[in-house]
């Protein structure tokens, strides 16, 4: 059992019951999955760029990413249908908790001028989206071995029904929200 899973079962569940007054244990929101997406726009000219993005993402997430492809051809963007344009990873269970722990305790504090993540990035259904501008904040990525600084989107999918419940869940888990 990971450190964050233990924290969830020992501290977060009682705190959520106290705050929201749940009657049933199954009502308590929990993390369902974390999706990490890396869109690589320059992959349309050079497919080799995608390989380094895939290797970076596999180091960060700890599992092999799948390629995301264009659904339709768009002449203005010079993309064809089924052309690989990025990669994504879906983390669940233990790997999800390990990644969330690493993100909150190690990676986010390494961001320059970090004052906390925005508390407004909820989608209305209890899911939280977070954009990261550079992959260098993760300890697995070595500065000398990257070809280009890339950003990524990280989406926390929860079972919460409202944004307020999801915000409290992530806050109890240790997400550093800006005041």
From Swiss-Prot:
This is Large ribosomal subunit protein uL5. Belongs to the universal ribosomal protein uL5 family. One of its GO terms (molecular function) is tRNA binding. The gene is rplE. InterPro entries: Ribosomal_uL5, Ribosomal_uL5_bac-type, Ribosomal_uL5_C, Ribosomal_uL5_CS, Ribosomal_uL5_dom_sf, Ribosomal_uL5_N. It comes from the Bacteria. One of its GO terms (biological process) is translation. Part of the 50S ribosomal subunit; part of the 5S rRNA/L5/L18/L25 subcomplex. Contacts the 5S rRNA and the P site tRNA. Forms a bridge to the 30S subunit in the 70S ribosome. The keyword rRNA-binding applies. It comes from Clostridium botulinum (strain Eklund 17B / Type B). This is one of the proteins that bind and probably mediate the attachment of the 5S RNA into the large ribosomal subunit, where it forms part of the central protuberance. In the 70S ribosome it contacts protein S13 of the 30S subunit (bridge B1b), connecting the 2 subunits; this bridge is implicated in subunit movement. Contacts the P site tRNA; the 5S rRNA and some of its associated proteins might help stabilize positioning of ribosome-bound tRNAs. Keywords: Ribonucleoprotein, Ribosomal protein, RNA-binding, rRNA-binding, tRNA-binding. It holds the Pfam family Ribosomal_L5. GO terms for cellular component: ribonucleoprotein complex; ribosome.
């Amino acid at each position: 059992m990971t450190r964050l899973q233990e924290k969830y079962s020992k501290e977060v569940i009682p705190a959520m019951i106290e705050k929201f007054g749940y009657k049933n244990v199954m009502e308590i929101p929990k993390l369902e999955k974390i999706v990490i997406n890396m869109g690589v726009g320059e992959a349309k000219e050079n497919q080799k760029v995608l390989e380094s993005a895939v290797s970076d993402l596999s180091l960060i997430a700890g599992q092999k990413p799948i390629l995301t492809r264009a659904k339709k051809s768009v002449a203005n963007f010079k993309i064809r249908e089924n052309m690989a344009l990025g990669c994504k990873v879906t983390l669940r269970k233990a790997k999800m908790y390990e990644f969330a722990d690493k993100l909150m305790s190690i990676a986010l504090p390494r961001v320059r001028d970090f004052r906390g993540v925005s508390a407004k990035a909820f989608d209305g259904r209890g899911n939280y989206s977070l954009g990261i501008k550079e992959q260098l904040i993760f300890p697995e990525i070595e500065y000398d071995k990257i070809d280009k600084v890339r950003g990524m989107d990280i989406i926390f999918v929860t079972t919460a029904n409202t944004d307020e419940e999801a915000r409290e869940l992530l806050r109890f888990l240790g997400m550093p929200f800006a005041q």
